[in-house]
Amino acid sequence: HSKDGQAKTTEAERVLVAPSLTWKPSDRTSLTVLTHYQRDPKSGSYGAVPSLGSAFDNPLGQLDPDFYDGDVNWEEFDRTQIAAGYEFEHSFDDTWTVRQNFRYLETDIDYRSVYPTALAGDNRTLGRASIYSDERTKSFAVDNQIQAKFTTGPIEHTLLAGLDYWKLNS
């Protein structure tokens, strides 16, 4: 999917595919396999415009609604994410249920941007700064749960306990 951004020369583009498959070998057991591929070669602009000249009047004039404060020759946003995982659930009976969820994620992002810092006192000079980030991350998480549903007299209870583990390498 591709679209023009709010500001001049900015565009957003995304490709996303996220198929999943659920298998239920019995009425008490299910396994869902999840996958995800996302590619964002463009992501619009993260810049901003000063309030004077856009939301509020500036005695020196108004900014165009599509004013762009960046640098089209330097800015870049390029991200790829790949993920896979599963959700497993098994009910032993009407009281006890166990679950395990797992996810693996890889992200690759290259980001360069120019952004405004402040409008100077002359109401016409916009200070700017830049940011650059080149990151590669890999992470995985596993979530284990045990659940008990029961009653004591007129009160219904749901007891949930679990253990999570998450690791991130960047």
Task: For every predicted segment, state its role.
Residues 6, 43-45, 110-112, 154-156, ...:
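Short acidic, gly/pro-rich beta-turn/loop elements at beta-sheet edges
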Residues 82-107, 130-170:
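Face-selective signature of the C-terminal outer-membrane beta-barrel domain
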Residues 1-4, 15, 37-41, 104-110, ...:
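Transmembrane beta-strands of outer-membrane beta-barrel pores
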Residues 18-24, 28-91, 106-137:
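Acidic/polar loop-and-plug regions of large Gram-negative outer-membrane beta-barrel proteins
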Residues 1-17, 25-29:
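Outer-membrane beta-barrel translocator/receptor signature
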